[in-house]
Design a protein with these regions (language model features):
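Conserved histidines in hydrophobic membrane contexts and catalytic metal-binding motifs
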Residues: 1-232
Length: 232
């Protein structure tokens, strides 16, 4: 047995011992993900739950005067007109993220008051609200770093059999997450272990990316060593 083969045996044995449970978990969680994804609010759901604009005809400015407020050089991908605490607001999806501008440039952006919070929640679930938590840090169901700008975030619990929860941004009342008990259960068996979606790790995008890359690299090295040992 030459030196390279001995090295490959050692690499395969050590990495196999360390990573076997991880790879078994990754393999089994992939089956769960074929039927259950990580709960997220889709763009279609958001469109369906948007507050109704006044049918009496709110006075809206010319769209060119609104786009003139965008930073120079920004390219607009899509535009949504919605109500923010009763005020018409344009949301522009751009190359620099989503930018929000009230139709009336003379007023400041309103805060999300209790009345608007409850009205928005009712659009998502008709059951009574049992509790509202004010979050100042990310949790397991909103572990993404880009949501930090929405802080504080309101977590709303509904009194229904499904265990429904809704997360709303305090900045504009946008729904950030909407899930029930069943979706959260399957996420623990599928998406969370498969994508390493643990809050403490996923909220740090750089660390999470490096962790996934290193685990992938070590897994590939283990497989290559195993193939070498088999062929040799």
């Amino acid at each position: 047995m030459n030196v390279i083969t001995k090295l490959m045996y050692s690499i395969h044995r050590i990495l196999g011992t360390l990573l076997c449970i991880l790879f078994l978990m990754w393999f089994l969680s992939a089956f769960v993900m074929m039927y259950h994804r990580f709960p997220r609010v889709s763009a279609k759901e958001k469109m369906q739950k948007l507050d109704m604009l006044s049918q009496t005809g709110d006075s809206l400015p010319d769209i060119s005067s609104v786009t003139a407020r965008l930073p120079r050089g920004v390219k607009v991908r899509s535009t949504i007109l919605n109500l923010n605490a009763g005020h018409p607001e344009f949301s522009f999806s751009t190359t620099k993220g989503t930018l929000h501008f009230l139709a009336d440039s003379t007023i400041s952006r309103p805060s999300l008051d209790s009345e608007h919070l409850h009205r928005t929640a009712a659009l998502w679930c008709s059951s009574p609200i049992t509790r509202i938590d004010t979050l100042h840090s990310l949790d397991q169901w909103i572990p993404f770093a880009e949501l930090k700008k929405e802080m504080p975030i309101y977590k709303i619990y509904f009194a229904d059999d499904a265990g429904t929860q809704l997360y709303l941004s305090s900045q504009n009342g946008e729904a950030l997450q909407f899930s029930n008990r069943s979706e959260r259960f399957w996420a623990w068996l599928g998406a969370i272990p498969h994508w390493v979606y643990f809050t403490w790790l996923r909220q740090d995008t750089v660390l999470w990316t490096k962790t996934v890359i290193w685990l992938t690299a070590l897994g590939c090295l283990m497989v290559i060593a195993g193939i070498w040992v088999t062929v040799d």
